[in-house]
Design a protein with these regions (language model features):
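Self-maturation zones of extracellular/virion spikes and adhesins
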Residues: 1-44
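Noncatalytic modules at the cell exterior or secretory-pathway interfaces
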Residues: 159-173
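Solvent-exposed serine/threonine-rich low-complexity stretches and specific carbohydrate-binding patches
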Residues: 140-148
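Short sequence segments immediately N-terminal to proteolytic processing junctions that release a mature
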Residues: 36-37, 46-62, 166
Length: 191
């Protein structure tokens, strides 16, 4: 079987339907990159695209990097803080509500296995731990600085997250935490 299209902007694809409503499509849909698209019956999303060089992208695969704007903060022992901006946001992450220490929590869009990375930069510390909190409980993803320390700490791990999980940062001890995208941030990428 061959599917041919007359011009680059045309479509040459296989369309899978239920009751004449399209729910999946694979082929050359409006461009020359091969793609697999899915629909809820109203809106199409590209699940996978492969260009002429053989490179693939997954434009709706959840991935994000979140940070909080400002200069610095000194969260109280036991306080939770959040984020104000996304440096990268793909796949439906949202900032949700507000945390006790300012900023918003992050709403996870899809269940799955994620690579998570936490970076925390401090100007000073009296001994502190900053951990990613999932639904209010501190997780194993954390960084710790001894008393008298300053600088950048980072840690990463693979985490199982569920759609609807709410993520924030949980602080123990005392530290002056530097803010901004290059200072303190959380990154997640669904594997």
């Amino acid at each position: 079987m061959k599917i041919n299209k007359a011009a680059a902007g045309d479509t040459g694809s296989l369309l899978f339907q239920t009751a004449y409503t399209g729910y999946a499509e694979l082929g050359l849909a409006g461009e020359n990159a091969f793609s697999i698209k899915v629909s809820d019956g109203n809106m199409w999303k590209t699940a996978l695209a492969i260009d002429a060089g053989g490179r693939h992208t997954r434009p709706n695969q959840p991935a994000m990097r979140a940070y909080r704007t400002g200069t610095s903060m000194t969260p109280a022992d036991g306080q939770q803080t959040g984020f104000t901006h996304f440096g990268v946001n793909r796949g439906g992450f949202e900032l949700l509500g507000s945390t006790s220490g300012g900023g918003s929590a992050i709403l996870v869009p899809a269940s799955g296995t994620y690579l998570a990375s936490l970076q925390v930069r401090t100007a000073s510390s009296s001994g502190h731990v900053t951990a990613v909190a999932a639904n209010g409980s501190a997780s194993a993803l954390q960084v710790a600085g001894p008393s008298g320390s300053s600088g950048t700490l980072s840690a990463s791990m693979i985490m199982e997250l569920e759609a609807g999980d709410i993520l924030s940062l949980h602080h123990s001890g005392t530290a002056t935490v530097m803010l901004g995208d290059g200072s303190t941030n959380l990154s997640l990428a669904m594997l």
